[in-house]
Each structure stands twice: as structure tokens, then as C-alpha cells.
Amino acid sequence: MQSDKDKTFDSWLVKAIGRVQGVGYRDACIRYARAQDITGWVRNRVDGSVELMLQGSKEQLADMCRWLRDGIPAAHVEKLEVSKVPPPSPRLNRFDRLPNL
């Protein structure tokens, strides 16, 4: 049986551009997302950016995006590109690291 959390959620694809690789950005994202009950994944891109799939309530995802900009002192995020993923996208079980792309 699905919980209410699984029935009503948004999915956002986010690309963090700037000094976001080699500074612990992905590990920090995983810890923060799991603590906030956000599901999805994070991975490095060959262009030097970090890409994330975020799933949760609009409020959770907006908070995560604010944190992505300023929550990691060693990183310098110049830009966040956010795209909403249209339903139906299946709810992921947890927040994980994917291989680089």
C-alpha cells in the first residue's frame, strides 16, 4: 500500500554549476537530502557540474535548492538550473549517488 507521501510528490532535475566537484558536494547533498526525507540521486557530470534528481514536496524541494546554493562552504554555486519532471515519474526509495556521467 502506498503512503500519502508516495502519492503526492514533485520531481525536479537540478544542475549545479560552479565549483561543485572535488569539494564534498555530493556527499553533503546525500546527507542533507536523507535528513530532509527527500529521495532521488546525485552524480558528477563531465562538464564539471553536479546533477541531482530530487523528489519530495514542493516545500522540501525549494528548501533543498536554497541549501544547494549556500549550504556547502567549500563549494561556489554560480547557477542552479531547475527543471520540473512531469508525472508520472516513479517515487525513488532513497537518495543515492549514481556513477559519473
From Swiss-Prot:
Could you tell me which species this protein originates from? Polaromonas naphthalenivorans (strain CJ2)
This chain belongs to the protein called: Acylphosphatase
Gene3D superfamilies per UniProt: 3.30.70.100
Q: Which gene encodes it?
A: acyP
Reaction it catalyzes: an acyl phosphate + H2O = a carboxylate + phosphate + H(+)
> What is the E.C. number?
3.6.1.7
* TM spans (from-to): none
Q: Mind telling me which InterPro entries this protein's record contains?
A: Acylphosphatase, Acylphosphatase-like_dom, Acylphosphatase-like_dom_sf, Acylphosphatase_CS
Which family is annotated? Belongs to the acylphosphatase family.
Oxidoreductase among the record's keywords?
no
Q: Which residues form the signal peptide?
A: none
Which PROSITE patterns does this one have?
A: ACYLPHOSPHATASE_2, ACYLPHOSPHATASE_3
GO MF, any single term: acylphosphatase activity
The uppermost taxa in this organism's lineage are: Bacteria, Pseudomonadati, Pseudomonadota, Betaproteobacteria, Burkholderiales
Q: Which domain of life is it from?
A: Bacteria
Keywords carried by this UniProt record = Hydrolase, Plasmid
